[in-house]
Amino acid sequence: MPTAFTEEEMKRIRGELINVGIRLSKELGLKKMSVEKITSAVGIAKGSFYLFFESKEDFILEAAKYAGQETQKMLLLKLNGRTQMSAHEFIEFFNEFIHSGLDLMNGLTIDDFFWLKKHIKKQALFDPEAQIQTARLWLSLINDVRDGIDVGTFVNLIKSIYAIREHRDTMVRESLESSVQILLRTIEIYISGKGNIYD
């Protein structure tokens, strides 16, 4: 039978579960990350997990929501009270994000993506319209967007970073990070129309 926790303990343990889950999702992948591994790392019984979350799928959605809120804080910090930033600053922010512990997509494998599509009912992750909306919001925060930018191309360029990481086993590993940096620079040039890939 799950242990009874105080309200304060519930809040603390919930936060620990989410942080451990984010870490384990990168180490093991979403598919291999079990409820037992999450609870064991936090030091609670497996059954106690269900006091906090209905299922592993519900847990993943909550972890994604938490990561999204923390990412928004990162973005506001980068804006530093302004309403917009340059394309260069946005790419700096995005580079920080994809290398932070908050990027749940970093480290996912093809198997993880198939698992997500099968088990997660909230499919904004795979919905092109939702991605276009997010991209439009991001572009509205950039003050030097060139005329004629295609939002879908912007989305696809960002997704290409994740495609490289997703297929890391078939890539030249030593060149993964330099490939990501070249893609980031390409995205910056595509947004602003300024500079070249070697600047």
Model-identified regions with their sequence ranges:
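An amphipathic alpha-helix adjacent to DNA-recognition modules
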Residues: K11-N19, K31-K32, F52-L76, N80
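Hydrophobic/aromatic residues within well-ordered alpha-helical segments
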Residues: I13, K56, A63, A67, ...
